[in-house]
């Protein structure tokens, strides 16, 4: 075995996926691994770099297509990817990198605001050595929340936003609203 593998962190909005991604990458940095994080270019909510919802920042390379940056990340042992659901080539990239000895850590939503799967992330699950599903706190009743609910009426899947546009909700509150 070449040591390469895929770790997948999934869950709804506000469940701490980006925070967990940063935590894992930092641990590898402490262990002297050469690490890089990648964020989706169109995610400009808080500025440059990778941001958590509680405003912690971590430097990150930006792209909209992962396969375009293969040469730029070849020298790194650990590759962290935030907002993985937005990359159309996430499956091919992760599989290629893991097969070539890289540790790939992906943080992604597992479902849309309509509770439909992000197909690329669903396809990444059977290729991953480790899958963790995080939960958030329901912003209505304060119980465990597994779903993201959009506050507006837009129907497009890719609308990037924070608490101004989305809430984490439990099943009961998702259905009753």
Swiss-Prot record:
Lineage of origin: Viruses, Varidnaviria, Bamfordvirae, Nucleocytoviricota, Pokkesviricetes
Root EC class: transferase
Annotated gene: OPG101
PANTHER family cross-referenced by the UniProt entry: THYMIDINE KINASE (PTHR11441), THYMIDINE KINASE, CYTOSOLIC (PTHR11441:SF0)
A Gene Ontology BP annotation from the UniProt entry: thymidine metabolic process
Family of this protein: Belongs to the thymidine kinase family.
The protein's name in its UniProt record: Thymidine kinase
Assembly description: Homotetramer. Two molecules of substrate bind to each enzyme tetramer.
Role according to the record: Phosphorylates thymidine and thymidine analogs, such as azidothymidine (AZT). Part of the salvage pathway for pyrimidine deoxyribonucleotide synthesis.
């Amino acid at each position: 075995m070449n040591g390469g593998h895929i770790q997948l962190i999934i869950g709804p909005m506000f469940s701490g996926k980006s925070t967990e991604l940063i935590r894992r990458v930092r641990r590898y940095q402490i262990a002297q691994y050469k690490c890089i994080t990648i964020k989706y270019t169109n995610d400009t909510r808080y500025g440059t770099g990778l941001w958590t919802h509680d405003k912690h920042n971590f430097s990150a390379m930006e792209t909209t297509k992962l396969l375009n940056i293969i040469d730029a990340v070849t020298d790194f042992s650990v590759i962290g990817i935030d907002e993985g659901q937005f990359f159309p080539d996430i499956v091919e990239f992760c599989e290629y990198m893991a097969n070539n000895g890289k540790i790939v850590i992906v943080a992604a939503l597992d479902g849309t605001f309509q509770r439909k799967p992000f197909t690329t992330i669903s396809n990444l699950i059977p290729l991953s050595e480790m899958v963790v599903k995080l939960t958030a706190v329901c912003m209505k009743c304060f119980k465990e929340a597994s779903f993201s609910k959009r506050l507006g009426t837009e129907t497009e899947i890719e609308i990037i936003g924070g608490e101004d546009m989305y809430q984490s909700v439990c099943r009961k509150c998702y259905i009753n609203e």
